[in-house]
Design a protein with these regions (language model features):
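Short cysteine/histidine-rich metal-coordination sites, predominantly Zn2+-binding motifs
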Residues: 57-65, 75-84
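N-terminal pre-ligand scaffold of iron-sulfur
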Residues: 1-56, 82-104
């Protein structure tokens, strides 16, 4: 399912990161110019919710001490699978995020 999040310039400034909620999921958005990257903030180890730590530059899991870098790659703890990256597009200035029912 694809969600129209809003005007990309209103949702996220260039170079910024932001956590949003869609369909009960926490999503981390990251913008570099006209490219927006989105990750599902659910740990790939045990399904626990993740937190984005702006100061530390990591995405962390309180359940088992797992951590991911800002590219979604596991860097600490038990996770071995990268975060699920969600499809994003900018359509006439609107940010679109697609959430599927399975991890990819």
């Amino acid at each position: 399912r694809t969600f129209r999040v809003g005007r990309v310039d209103d949702v996220l400034a260039d170079g910024a990161r932001k956590t949003i909620q869609l369909e009960g999921k926490s999503i981390l958005l990251s913008r570099r110019g006209e490219q927006v990257i989105a990750f599902d903030l659910t740990c790939t180890h045990a399904g626990c919710p993740l937190a984005y730590n702006a100061k530390g530059g990591r995405i962390t899991c309180a359940c088992h001490g797992g951590a991911f870098d800002l590219d979604g790659k596991p860097v600490a703890g038990p996770p071995t699978i990268p975060l699920t990256r969600l499809e994003c597009a900018i359509d006439n200035g609107d940010l679109l995020v697609h959430i599927s029912g399975t991890q990819s």
